[in-house]
Design a protein with these regions (language model features):
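Catalytic loop of the DD-peptidase/beta-lactamase superfamily, centered on the K-T-G motif
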Residues: 1-36, 94-95, 111, 116, ...
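Active-site SXXK
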Residues: 4, 36-60, 105-111, 152, ...
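Short alpha-helix boundary/capping elements
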Residues: 23-24, 45, 79
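Active-site helix/loop module of the DD-peptidase/beta-lactamase fold
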Residues: 35-40, 52-88, 112-144, 164, ...
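Aromatic- and histidine-enriched alpha-helix N-cap/loop-to-helix transition segments
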Residues: 35-44, 66-69, 97-104, 146-150
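Generic detector of well-ordered secondary structure
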Residues: 51, 76, 108, 128, ...
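Extracytoplasmic/secreted proteins, especially bacterial periplasmic and envelope-associated proteins
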Residues: 70-73, 101, 105, 121, ...
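Short, contiguous, well-ordered secondary-structure segments
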Residues: 84-95, 104-110
Length: 270
């Protein structure tokens, strides 16, 4: 049995996934089906914002968010703002406070600088060029994307081999920002430290963790509370989408799935 087929055992009405490798893309399920991907949104939105940085519409270290915060702080959950409000929960740079409100704030700044709604900017700058024609932002820039496995494969391919965004920009996105910060990964508790890039959560030494325990420290990605995730590690990437909200069912199954897939990758590469 292919390791990817483990996804078919998840207790959800609909599941689909893809494994990207140097030799090609393996898929399972209806890869054209649209899903509410929740916080996997942050990966796509962060790349859209970084395109605005490349274009000079905004600067990564310009003031943004609460006093003393920058766009960099907002994108790496270091601004101190709460999850769902712009109220400061902690001082800037004090702790990794996971925040969708911070992404909404960052997207608003880009929208003002670009002179157009952020969803339009994202569509014109990133989604259309990548051919992500089933992907659209409906509401929050922190968790409002609708997408499909097919489209997220295109996004993951851009992360593996950037054609639209500059490789240096992508490298910065996958570099740990404010590396000593501790923080909580939703559903997985406090981690000291809790590494995060710009958009991308970095695996580091986190345990327990949705990516599993055998992934490389620089593996990067995100999961969504709707039962979705995307990770990139080395020359490989995985997309998994389900229509059952994240919960206790997901913790063992996601970890087992990812550990089995990564073990298979390592065995094949040896």
């Amino acid at each position: 049995m292919s390791a990817l087929e483990k996804i078919a055992q998840w207790p959800a009405d609909n599941v689909a996934g893809a494994l990207l490798a140097p030799t090609g893309v393996e898929t399972i399920g209806d890869t054209a089906r649209e899903y509410d991907i929740k916080s996997v949104t942050k990966l796509v939105v962060a790349m859209g914002i970084m395109l605005a940085v490349e274009e000079g519409a905004v600067e990564l270290d310009q003031p943004a968010g609460p006093e003393g915060s920058t766009l960099r702080h907002l994108l790496s959950h270091a601004s101190g703002v709460d999850f769902d409000s712009r109220q400061a929960k902690r001082p800037v740079g004090d702790r990794r406070i996971y925040s969708s409100a911070g992404y909404e704030w960052a997207a608003e700044i880009v929208s003002e600088a670009a002179g157009m709604p952020f969803e339009e900017y994202l569509d014109e700058g990133l989604l259309k060029p990548l051919g992500m024609n089933s992907t659209r932002l409906e509401g929050s820039a922190g968790h409002g994307l609708i997408s499909s496995v097919n489209d997220l494969v295109k996004f993951a391919s851009e992360v593996l081999d950037p054609q639209i965004i500059h490789p240096d920009t992508l490298a910065e996105m996958r570099t740990i920002q404010f590396p000593d910060l501790r923080g909580i990964v939703p559903g997985y508790g406090m981690h000291r430290p809790c590494p995060w890039g710009l958009g991308f959560e970095i695996h580091g030494e986190k345990n327990p963790h949705w990516m599993g325990t055998n992934m490389p420290a620089d593996a990067a990605g995100h999961f969504g509370m709707s039962g979705t995730y995307l990770w990139v590690a080395g020359d490989y990437a995985m997309v998994a989408l389900a229509d059952r909200d994240f919960g206790e069912w997901a913790k063992p199954l996601w970890q087992e799935t990812n550990e089995e897939i990564w073990a298979g990758i390592q065995a094949a590469d040896d």
